[in-house]
């Protein structure tokens, strides 16, 4: 049986590029997408060694349905690439009561990641890959209060928090499951020419960033490296080598908060309480 890789946000950008590369290397690719039309179109594009399952990362019922469908068809997963994410969106609250950026990028991702362990924990060299961003560096202190408060909401700041929290959660998860056969890695693909930035306003800062965007093929390389290397570097972020933006994959240190074990444990407990999975590990 082929190795199985599951990708969320698989119908565009880095997710789509990764899906194509995995398929070309013999993997069966499960495409997790919110938009059914786009998901089915991607399945057709990838070919017979792929299957689309609908998922909305803001909705735990949708995530549960996705997982149940996955488990009904596959008895194991070799790679889970948690890629789905949004940025610079107007303030809104999800069905689960989270601000939408954090609800999609962090809480939904964490919820699905923990569920995926059941299909991965006994699989040799299985790997969870979490998308992140150097945006995490802009955060200097942890925040737990007011995350659903529209009066203090900042699209960029909440996006930055979502990436820091995702990184910290991943490092802590990897530490907690060190006796299982599954490893966890974090990837920053660089600022690429993808649909993630489609809602960004044409500010001076954005126009400067736009000049330095790299192509998707450069961005996907760290994903493939982190998911297939036989010598995974723990508690490092895989990214393009040159200023985390250009060149071949390398690794670098995360925000220093990600190495604070007390802060990680606090975030871990806070997260499991918010997503209703206190007894998962």
Regions found by a protein language model. Give the residues of each.
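NAD(P)H-dependent oxidoreductase Rossmann-fold/reductase module
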Residues: 1-73, 78-80, 85, 136, ...
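Short glycine-centered segments of the SAM/dcSAM-binding site in methyltransferase folds
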Residues: 28, 125-127
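Amphipathic alpha-helical dimer-interface segment in Rossmann-like NAD(P)H-dependent oxidoreductases
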Residues: 71, 104-124, 136, 174-175
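Short alpha-helical oligomerization interface
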Residues: 90-104, 151-152
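Conserved catalytic-core motifs of eukaryotic protein kinase domains, centered on the activation segment
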Residues: 90-94, 123, 140-142, 197-198
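Conserved internal alpha-helix within the Rossmann fold of NAD(P)-dependent oxidoreductases
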Residues: 108-113, 127, 166, 219, ...
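Carboxylate/His-rich catalytic cores and anion/metal-binding grooves
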Residues: 130
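Residue(s) in the substrate-gating loop at a strand-loop-helix junction
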Residues: 133
């Amino acid at each position: 049986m082929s190795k199985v890789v599951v990708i969320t946000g698989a119908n565009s950008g880095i997710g789509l590029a990764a899906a194509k590369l995995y398929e070309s290397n013999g993997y069966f690719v499960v495409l997790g997408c919110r938009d059914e039309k786009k998901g089915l179109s991607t399945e057709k594009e990838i070919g017979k060694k792929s299957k689309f399952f609908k998922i909305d990362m803001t909705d735990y019922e949708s995530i549960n349905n996705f997982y149940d469908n996955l488990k009904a068809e596959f008895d194991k997963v070799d790679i889970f690439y948690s890629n789905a994410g949004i940025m610079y969106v107007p303030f809104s609250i999800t069905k689960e009561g989270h601000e939408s950026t954090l609800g999609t990028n962090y809480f939904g991702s964490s919820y699905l990641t923990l569920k995926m362990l059941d299909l991965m924990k006994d699989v040799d060299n299985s790997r969870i890959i979490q998308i992140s961003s150097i945006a995490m560096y802009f955060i200097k202190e942890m925040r737990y209060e007011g995350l659903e408060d529209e009066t203090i909401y900042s699209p960029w700041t909440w996006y930055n928090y979502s990436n820091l929290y995702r990184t910290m959660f991943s490092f802590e998860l990897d530490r907690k499951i060190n006796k299982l056969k599954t490893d966890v890695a974090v990837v920053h693909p660089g600022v690429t020419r993808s649909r993630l930035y489609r809602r960004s306003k044409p500010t001076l800062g954005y126009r400067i960033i736009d000049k330095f965007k790299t192509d998707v093929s450069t961005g996907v390389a760290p994903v493939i490296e982190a998911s297939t290397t036989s010598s995974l570097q723990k508690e490092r972020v895989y990214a393009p080598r040159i200023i985390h933006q250009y060149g071949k994959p390398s690794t670098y240190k995360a925000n220093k908060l990600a190495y604070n074990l007390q802060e990680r444990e606090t975030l871990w407990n806070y997260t499991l309480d918010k997503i209703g999975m206190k007894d998962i590990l």
